[in-house]
Design a protein with these regions (language model features):
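GH16 jelly-roll
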Residues: 1-245
Length: 245
């Protein structure tokens, strides 16, 4: 049965979603998302009081509210974990394996809108589950920076997958990202199509060939040039649904 989550009820489905961003490199406490599920919407936000993520190990100050549909890591002190952001990174807090939703090919879409400032960004992407190190490619469904609000990033990041090549672009689209739009990928063997509101915006003749988990997040960069001018702004990413068909 195709996966669908319309965020009904008053909380996330804990069998599917982990309301933390890469907790193995931080901790469950320090990686916890600020979120609300209400009126059939998921609302991720970064309020002023939210602290930094991986303050001691991430090169640039970063705040994030994110959820993910799977998690996996080795023991504390090991280097086994999903999406390491630098060489030699070690697991700070071991995570119990959870595969909530890990599709392998399909037409996947989200209906989303975002409220960003020039110091923030929002993204939805699929990440290889990394049960084997090379199964680490990413399919970026969308990535939008507040400093370039009409540029909608989409593509593939290879990371440690030797079968993929890096191919990412951010075409400027005539849309208002503060309004709801449907962002989708048609992921098939050897090909990924990227769509916005049903219109194809990119096609790549390559594709990861393994299970992937969905990552949904809003990010704030406090050290970005001019960031102080927007310190009072609360970045938000709102989702109406996530589904496959």
């Amino acid at each position: 049965m195709p996966f669908r989550d319309h965020f009904e009820g008053d909380d996330l489905d804990g069998s599917v979603w982990i309301p933390h961003y890469l907790p193995q490199w931080s901790s469950r406490v320090e990686s916890a998302a600020t979120y609300e599920v209400a009126d059939s919407e998921l609302r991720l936000s970064i309020p002023a009081e939210q602290g930094l993520w991986c303050a001691e190990t991430h090169e640039q100050p970063l705040r994030v509210s994110g959820i993910q549909s799977g998690v996996f890591s080795g023991e504390a002190g090991s280097t086994v974990g999903q999406q390491p952001f630098r060489d030699g990174l070690v697991v700070r807090e071991a995570q119990a394996t959870q595969w909530g939703w890990t599709p392998h090919f399909g037409f996947l879409e989200v209906r989303a809108r975002m409220e960003l400032s020039p110091r923030s960004m929002a993204s939805v992407w699929l990440a290889g589950i990394e049960d084997e190190p090379q199964r680490s490619g990413e399919i970026c469904v969308f990535e939008v920076f507040g400093a370039a609000i009409d540029a909608v990033g989409a593509g593939i990041h290879r990371f440690r997958d030797p079968s993929l090549r890096e191919d990412f672009a951010a075409p400027r689209l005539p849309i208002e990202v503060s309004e709801f739009h449907v962002y989708a990928v048609d992921w098939r063997p050897g090909r990924v199509d990227f769509l916005v509101d049903g219109k194809q915006v990119r096609t790549l003749e390559q594709a990861p060939d393994y299970p992937m988990q969905m990552m949904i997040g809003v990010f704030d960069f406090p050290a970005k040039a001019g960031a102080a001018e927007h310190a009072g702004h609360v970045p938000q990413l709102l989702l109406d649904y996530v589904r496959e068909r």
